[in-house]
Amino acid sequence: MPPPRSSAAPTLAELRRLTESAGGSAGAAGPDAAPTLPFGVAGLDAALPGGGLALGALHQIHEGGPRGRYAATAVLFAGGILARLDGPVLWCLHSRDLFAPALARVGLHPDRVVYCETWRDAEVLPAMEEGLRHRGLAGVVGELTRMALTPSRRLQLAAEGSGVTALVVHRLCAGEAAEPEPSAARTRWRVAPAPPEGIDRRMDRRLGRPRWRLELQRCRGGAPGGWIVEACDAQGRLAIPAVLADRPAAPERVLRRAVR
């Protein structure tokens, strides 16, 4: 859950001061083309216009499984993206299950995060829109169960106007269909843990980072696709898993086989 408030933690009253020091007050973005944030995974970046995730735009991230089971994976994917951007982050949520130390493990330090706690989706959306007016933010995250087309258009326009990236992490409710509604988001992602293939599960956990099944379901001007990637590291970076089956056996293993 979000850390308890203390004198050291940023408050909403300090948000304007933080954003002004990071990049100025709210206002329209310049006429230059929107920058992108490459993931560093060749096939993934090739599917995205400009070779990376468009900044100053709205993106949707869905948990790829039954309600609540993979919500943490979607949150960590969002955290890894924002970890590689400069400035504070406004995180709008209406449930208290966000685990701040987990965000730190993907590179997003809790000191960078300003939490906006609400009671329902209807309060998350205006909080996000307000945050997107502040150009010094690295990004604005909103945890929502549903988002209709009209609110998504408002968020997309606000992101375009300020150049601040907006991420909506969808949290499924009981009885809700997993199929997403139409929206104005630039991309729509679905992320879930990927079970290991061809090796023992316990060995897979010892050999490196967890694996995710990452799907780009919709991309304006790009190509949908799916990838198995290693989860974000301490700098928020994804990676392609090593192909263990193609590695030569270790010398000790070869020697043991020869003795037998």
Task: Specify the residue positions occupied by each region the protein language model found.
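Conserved nucleotide-cofactor-binding alpha/beta core module
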Residues: P88-E143, L149-R153, L157-S162, R171-L172
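Glycine-rich, charge-decorated loop segments at or immediately adjacent to ligand/cofactor-binding or catalytic sites
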Residues: F99-L103, A174-A192
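A short secondary-structure junction signal
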Residues: T150-R154, A178-P182, G226-I228
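C-terminal functional extensions of proteins
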Residues: R188-R260
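Short gly/pro/ser/thr-enriched loop/turn and capping motifs at secondary-structure boundaries
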Residues: A122, C173-A178, G198
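Detector for small/aliphatic-rich hydrophobic stretches
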Residues: M1-W91, P110, Q217-G222, A239-R260
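Short, structured patches in soluble enzyme cores that scaffold and shape functional sites
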Residues: E143-T145, V168-R171, P193, R218
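Hydrophobic/aromatic beta-strand patches that form the interior of the parallel beta-sheet core
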Residues: H59, L90, V114-C116, L167, ...
